[in-house]
Amino acid sequence: MRRATAWLAAVLMLLMPLTAVAEEGQRAPDYLMEGYDEATHDWETNRFFQRMQEKTDIAFEFREYTDAEAWAGRKKAIASGEDLPDVLFKAQLTAAETRDMAAAGILTDLKPYLAEYAPDLWQLLQAHPDYLEAITLPDGSSPVLPSISELPNNDLMWINTAWLKNLHLEMPSTADELTEVLRAFRNGDPNRNGKADEVPLTFIGMWELRFLGHAFGLYDNDYYLHAEDGVVSSGLRTDENRQFLTWLHQLWEEKLLDRQGFSTMDTLRQITDANAAIPYGMILSNSPVTVVPSGAMSQYGVLAPLKWDGKQIYRDLLGPVTRGTFALTKNCQKPERLIAWVNFLYTHEGSLLAQVGQEGDEYFLNEDGTWDWMADLETVANDVLPNSTLADGGVAPGVIELAFQQKYTDTTTTGMIAEMLKSREFTRMPMPLVFLSAEDEKRIAELQSRIAPWAEQQMAAFVTGDTPITDESWTAFTAGLESRGLDEMIGIWQKYVH
């Protein structure tokens, strides 16, 4: 930690200009920073920026947007070159905005500065070439920097382990074994309330059900695509998808799937009474707390990906990289100073300062290496996080470290992290993050609007039996995909995957 701070101070001292001072004796800002954050954050008074100024002697004038629509409009003005700031922070730049602003000369290529002025970030990018690829335009430039989160974040299979225990069942490891477990959940009164009120498996829509497709080797993204060994393909027309949908129809017919799954939402299925009997055997969600009271969290554990053909694979929904969090415009003088400034957020010390604040002020370390907040959780939520950190709100550049969060004293939080990590070794990003040309992006949007809603509707009909799965109906389904441009979609994406 000391070495990171010392290095940062040394670099900035070499680059530091004479400090300008306003007439009132107030420090004049060195750079103009602009970006988006939630209304609970005020960059002018946030202790993170104050502490960073003490460390780096860089002061900012802030233009903070707290309204998402207003920031979207402002980004359009920036793209046209109107009243440019020096730095965009928590910028939420889309791939298209990054591409277009870079092409217009609005954004500075940051890659030439990284090895010398951002060695910690550069080391991360060298260790993970896919991270570097994700922020690199086709011309080789990198006008934006990422947020890199080591924390697990995915739509997972949360199974009621208390029910498994009540019914003396083992964790299922295949689709067939899961079917047997769901039948036991339906028949065995596992919540012990004497009523047949159990919902063996709850979900929201075909989008969420598709995460079960891994049990048949399927892990397509929202474009229904995946890439293996540089070849882009779709699982939609495969025999595996037909087998998957046939299995789902079986679950539906046996009332093992939530009958409201195609029409409900979290607010409608959520159990708010802490004393109520829990009706859900398995929940497809990023967390059970979206459906059950926090007190019931301990009943659930993550079901590891089911085996298919002797292998386990699961879709990684988001991946570790969020692009477009930080950029410098052509107005920025001495960009190397801000590259050194932001590099600190990719160090251990900088990550903690951004995410949890300063040791001794916002949190403390125990002798055993665990940590806890100095204040109660209500104060943490209402004061510490919004006023002393970059946590929440817009996504900031930097790294969010898993190891530190695993040492939090709250066992509910660390237990949930441990559960979510169970599937990580099997997760795979279906497609790499790339930058599309404007022409290809437009065409893909057109094709997606034809393919995705229709495909989801047809698959849902297969599940519910509204459309029986026969050779004729399956041929019609695959023909419908082809007529809507699935092969063209694959061909466009293939140009960007090697």
What are these regions (language model features)?
Residues 8-17:
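Bacterial N-terminal signal peptides
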Residues 97-112, 292-313:
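Ligand-binding "clamshell"
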